[in-house]
Structures are given as structure tokens and as C-alpha cells.
């Protein structure tokens, strides 16, 4: 926060990434609370390897504005808390909360194929369910170098494997800008997003 407030470095958000197993996001609740109380955007690596509870922790303990991956959101078999009796209802309510709150899921198709051997085909990815539930989704690379990909490659992979209308494709692209962590005022961000949409519509 000191660096953000006392320098010209455009610090826009706080993130946690790494292995989820044995390292739940809520262990960093104090850090996320601090970021939240100082008006910094927050994203959390959740639901890549661990299940829906990891995403629940990200939004309830860490005030996540965005979720990195979210792949396992709909996996009932990944729920480990014995006190959760109705797993289907738990997932339904969690997905509805994400959709209603417009918490954006950063979907990383190529990376998930590379790191999750249980994902045999991109068509098995939970992206289609996310879209069915009207979640705010953006297409991301996770990393360009290790995964040897780009946003354009990821968008093509999506269009080649999922049945998208032109409107839905545009919505996904636009969500990436609307839900970005922008360095500047909300008014400036609206102007920026407007320019992005105008450019999209011109090509």
C-alpha cells in the first residue's frame, strides 16, 4: 500500500498463486483483509486443483473480485467438508453467488489441459457450465511463456471447441476489460472500456 500511495507505480491488485493443496487461501485472510480495507482489488488462485470450497474461501475470506481458474467449481466429488450434506445445492448457490456478484473467473484453457491430467479434452472443461450459469468469464493465458500461448490462441481454442454465439464471444472479450483492475478513476475506466468496445465493433 505504501508503494501504491507514495510512488507512481501503477499497483492495481493483490494476488495469491501457487499450490492449493495444503495451502488454503484463507490462511492469508489477514493480508486480504488489509488489501480490502485499503481499497485494493483482489484476485485469488482457486479451484484449479482443489474443489468448490477453495472458491468459497476465496470469495468469503479473501473478498475476491476475480477467481484464477475456477476449473473445479462444479465438482461435487472435490468437496471434502463432511458437514456439507447437499453438495449439489452448495455448488448451485456458490455458482449463483459468483454470477450475481459478477465475480469474474479467469479461465485458462491451455494451462488447465497441461496441468490437470484428469482433463482429457478441452470439451470437458467447465467453461460451458460457467457460461450456462451466466458467470462473468474472461479468457486468460495463466502464463504465456510456459504454456506457449497467447490470448488470441486461447480465444481461438474457445471458439473451436465451444458453441458460442457472436454476442457471447463479444461479452467474454468485453468482460476482460470491464472486470480489469484499472489504474485510475472509475470515470476513466468507463472511457477506456468504451474505447475498447468501439474498437472491437470496428473490426
PLM regions with names:
Residues 153, 157, 163-203:
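Mid-to-C-terminal alpha-helical segments outside catalytic/metal-binding sites
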Residues 124-141, 196-203:
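Surface-exposed, interaction-prone regions with an acidic/low-complexity signature
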Residues 66-78, 145, 183:
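Glycine-rich phosphate-binding active-site loops on the catalytic face of alpha/beta enzymes
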Residues 111-116, 138-140, 156-161:
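Short beta-alpha connecting loops at secondary-structure transitions
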Residues 1-13, 21-65, 79-103, 121-135, ...:
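Histidine/acidic residue-rich metal-binding segments in metalloenzymes
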Residues 18-24, 48-50, 73-75, 112-117, ...:
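Short, small-residue-enriched loops and turns at beta-alpha junctions
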Residues 43-49, 109, 135-152:
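Short acidic/histidine-rich active-site segments
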Amino acid at each position: 500500500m505504501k508503494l501504491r500511495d507514495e510512488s507512481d507505480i501503477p499497483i492495481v491488485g493483490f494476488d495469491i498463486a501457487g499450490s492449493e493443496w495444503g495451502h488454503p487461501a484463507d490462511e492469508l485472510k489477514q493480508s486480504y483483509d488489509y488489501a480490502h480495507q485499503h481499497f485494493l482489488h483482489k484476485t485469488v488462485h482457486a479451484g484449479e486443483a482443489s474443489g468448490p470450497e477453495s472458491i468459497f474461501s476465496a470469495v468469503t475470506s479473501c473478498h475476491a473480485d476475480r477467481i484464477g481458474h475456477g476449473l473445479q467449481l462444479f465438482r461435487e466429488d472435490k468437496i471434502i467438508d463432511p458437514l456439507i450434506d447437499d453438495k449439489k445445492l452448495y455448488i448451485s448457490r456458490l455458482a449463483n453467488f459468483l454470477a450475481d456478484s459478477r465475480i469474474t473467473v479467469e479461465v485458462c484453457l491451455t494451462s488447465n489441459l497441461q496441468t490437470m491430467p484428469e482433463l482429457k479434452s478441452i470439451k470437458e472443461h467447465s467453461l460451458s457450465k460457467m457460461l450456462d450459469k451466466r458467470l462473468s468469464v474472461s479468457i486468460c493465458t495463466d502464463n504465456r511463456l510456459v504454456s506457449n500461448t497467447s490470448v488470441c490462441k486461447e480465444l481461438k481454442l474457445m471458439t473451436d471447441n465451444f458453441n458460442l454465439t457472436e454476442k457471447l464471444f463479444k461479452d467474454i472479450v468485453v468482460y476482460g476489460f470491464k472486470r480489469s483492475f484499472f489504474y485510475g478513476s472509475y470515470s476513466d475506466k468507463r472511457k477506456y472500456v468504451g474505447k475498447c468496445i468501439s474498437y472491437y465493433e470496428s473490426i
